[in-house]
Amino acid sequence: MSATGRGNKRIFQDDYPTPAWPVHRLLEKVRLPAGTWVEPACGQGNIVKAVNQVKKGVKWVTIDINPEYPADLTGDFTYFDGAILKGLMPAKGLFDVCITNPPYKLAQAFVNQGLRIARYVVMLLRVNFLEGDDRQPWMEENTPSLAVLPNRPSFREFIDPETGKKTSTDACAYG
């Protein structure tokens, strides 16, 4: 689905691989500790690979809903309770960092779950995620830090098999 309503088809389970450069840019702007990180929508591992290219000392726990992906745990991250994650969590009880490019329609649930299980939560989301009256009370209690990527990441660069057309995202700011 396109932000401007041009009719692009949504990819199943919002599976849009994340390019390495926005992750690298984000890590330049945000200081995050080494330790145990969780990637709850890991897909093919693009974010894990990108982080590992520029940061040392990170141990990973990966999760994805799609059983075809090489994740440590398969299932819907937004429904996992502490018991499911406990065996994968560090001894101190929280992951050091939760980082992902969540399915946009589930972004709020991913953020909320991340806040429950990690000391730092990093989400690659369109800036317009912060808009909306329904998020106002949540934002007052959980005011996020924001790093804006001035170059537009494209998470949809693929050829549609039905039309043969290249498609991509069209929002102009990510944070």
Model-derived segments and their meaning:
Residues M1-G175:
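Class I S-adenosyl-L-methionine-dependent methyltransferase catalytic core
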